[in-house]
Structure formats: C-alpha cells, structure tokens
Amino acid sequence: MTIADLPLLPLGRGTDLTSERGVECPGDLPPASDPALVERARAAKAALGDRVFVLGHHYQRDEVIQFADVTGDSFKLAREAAARPDAEYIVFCGVHFMAESADILTGPSQQVILPDLAAGCSMADMARLTQVEMAWDALAAAGVADSVVPVTYMNSSADIKAFCGRNGGLVCTSSNAEVALEWAFEQKGGVEGDAKILFLPDQHLGRNTAVLKMGLSVDDCVVWDPFRPGGGLTPEQLRAAKVILWRGHCSVHGKFSPDVVDELRATIPGVQILVHPECTHELVLKADLVGSTEFIIKTIEAAPSGSSWSIGTELNLVKRLSAAHPDKNISFLDKTVCYCSTMNRIDLPHLVWALESLVAGTVVNRIEVDPETETWALLALERMLALPGKSHKD
C-alpha cells in the first residue's frame, strides 16, 4: 500500500493505558490552514530576524515544518537551540517535554515558546513524579533501591529527568540507550552483580535495548505498573529482576502490529522492514532494521534506487521520506494508524499567533523549568553527554 492510498486516521481519542497498542484513531485529516497564514508567518519571521529561532521536530506537519530553521529529533533540536545564544526567542514546534529540555539547555536570556500548550506527550505523561517516587519507596521497602540506577528516555518530563539526576541516574536517547544502560549497570558493580535499572517511561525501548543489545533475557525484565499496588510485582520479583520497566509506551509506535509484517512480506517482494525501537518487542523481532528517527532517515537516503521499504514510525516523517525519495518504494507499516495527535496540535494558526505576538512585543506560552528541577535535570543530561562513543540522537 502506497502513502497516497493510505486511509488516514490522524486524531486519537486519547491513550488507553490498559492497551499495548495505544489509541483509537477515528476522524479525518485536520482541515488545511488558510493559505493567507503562510504569508503572515513569513512576514512575522522576517520582522523578527535573528531574534527568533524556529525548531521543527521530524513528526511535525508540513505546513509547520516549512518554517523551521532546523529540523531534527528532540535532543538535536534542544542542542541546536543552545548553540544559538544570540536568539532571544526559541519557538519549539514539538511537544512539551522537548521545550522543557530546550529551556534547560539554553541560557537565561533566552525564552522558549511552545505554540500550543496542549501539545503534550502521552508517553511522558505516563510517568508522573509522584508515581515514580512511590515506586522508589517500594524498591526501598523491597531492599533493592540501593542497587537501582534510574534511567529515563529523553521523552520524559523535566521532573523525571531531575529525579534521575538526584538519584545517580541519567537520560538516554534511542541511539545511545545501550551505552546508557551499560553505564548505569557499572555504577552498581556491573550487570553480573546485584545492579538493577529502573527504566522510564517507555517499556519497549527499555526491553528492546536490554534484550537485543545487551543480551539479557525477557525474563530479566519486569514491568512496573503504577496503577497497581506494588507495581503489580512481589518483592521477590523485584529482587530477581535486572531491568524494571515502567509501564509506558508511545501511542503511535505501539499500534504497529507484527501481523502486518507477514502480510507485507507476502505482497511486496524484497521489502525491508524498518522500525523505531519504541515499537513492541514482538514487532522489532520481525524487522530487518531498527533505529532512531535519524537512523531511519539516513537508511532511506543511502538505500539503492528501486528498493522497497515499509517504515514503522510517525506518518508525517514517512510521508516526507516518500516524497523526497520517489525512486524508492516507501510504504507505511500499517493499513491505518494515527499521526501523533499531540504533535499535530502545533499547526499554522498557533505558529502564526506565537510569532505575531513576538512581533507585537508579547511572549506567549513561555516554557520555564524551575531552578532546582533544572539543576538536577541538567546533571542527568550532562551524564548522558559524557557517555563514550555513541550518538546522542533520538
């Protein structure tokens, strides 16, 4: 099935926390924005000049991404913002945790703006600080907290990053998760000893990394459910585990079904299955290649003309890759699936409103992380940046 033929179902009703497969996706594409807004956005950007720097995540819609000064994954964009100290305003076309990370990494004279404050992340919201602190207390009660290092995926709130910083842990991306877990185990004597990891908030990235990259078994991993007493685990299970996975997932990547892979291989000769590690372990086992958004982009760029690919990641990115590489047969790894509904809250009307407000001298939707949280979250990020040898890209 080509991108053009795909029945599009972009707007979810919200995350089903009891399901591994994310959200329901009724509805149609959002209506196209008024073409006049394009000229207004251009005029506002021109009026602001170098005072504004617009960041666009790979999953943003085309009407927004055209105005980005830089596109990339969440951590690349935060670092790009930090590398532009002369820009007074950082307009982040992404979601809330990304804007928080940009605020943490930029200077005090810079202001980070999120065009729509409702652009959150369901995965990041699955790990709340109070829940994580309760889990930490339960680990202490089980007698294992002193052996645990918390590791959080970049896709988490500043509060969770700070929790990891305070408790000897760090942040990771999908590219450096393996080396981050290796570092974490080493802090408590190594994987062969009593060391354990609490991995937040994406269980699938944690499981895929622990099992497929580090050689642990699926049975070495247990899942902590914050909605069940004791996480749904016994003290004995906690003591036996090597990796304690938080019960979180990406609502988009969680929808891809392993069954689709078999159908695609039967209908598209020679198709290569390329997926993001936020997908379920069962799907990843059936894929040919697994990697971050940057890895996916580079893989398609380097692929030979005429090759066939089915990609399991957010649809906006897959559509752009298909348009950019017409010499390759690129399809989407499902018959119907959501766009990231929260990412798509950043639309052209919100971007124009944010930019025109700046032209008028008003800062709207500023994202500010409080100083204490920023200090500890920055420590967790700096530990990641000090890791040897691996990319720090999503």
UniProtKB/Swiss-Prot annotation:
One of its GO terms (biological process) is 'de novo' NAD biosynthetic process from L-aspartate. Binds 1 [4Fe-4S] cluster per subunit. Belongs to the quinolinate synthase family. Type 3 subfamily. GO terms for cellular component: cytosol. It catalyses: iminosuccinate + dihydroxyacetone phosphate = quinolinate + phosphate + 2 H2O + H(+). One of its GO terms (molecular function) is 4 iron, 4 sulfur cluster binding. This is Quinolinate synthase. Its cofactor is [4Fe-4S] cluster. The gene is nadA. It holds the Pfam family NadA. Keywords: 4Fe-4S, Cytoplasm, Iron, Iron-sulfur, Metal-binding, Pyridine nucleotide biosynthesis, Transferase. It is found in: Cytoplasm. Catalyzes the condensation of iminoaspartate with dihydroxyacetone phosphate to form quinolinate. Pathway: Cofactor biosynthesis; NAD(+) biosynthesis; quinolinate from iminoaspartate: step 1/1. [4Fe-4S] cluster binds at C121, C250, C340. Iminosuccinate binds at H57, S74, Y153, M154, N155, S174, H276, P277, E278, T293. It is an enzyme of class 2 (transferase). Its EC number is 2.5.1.72.
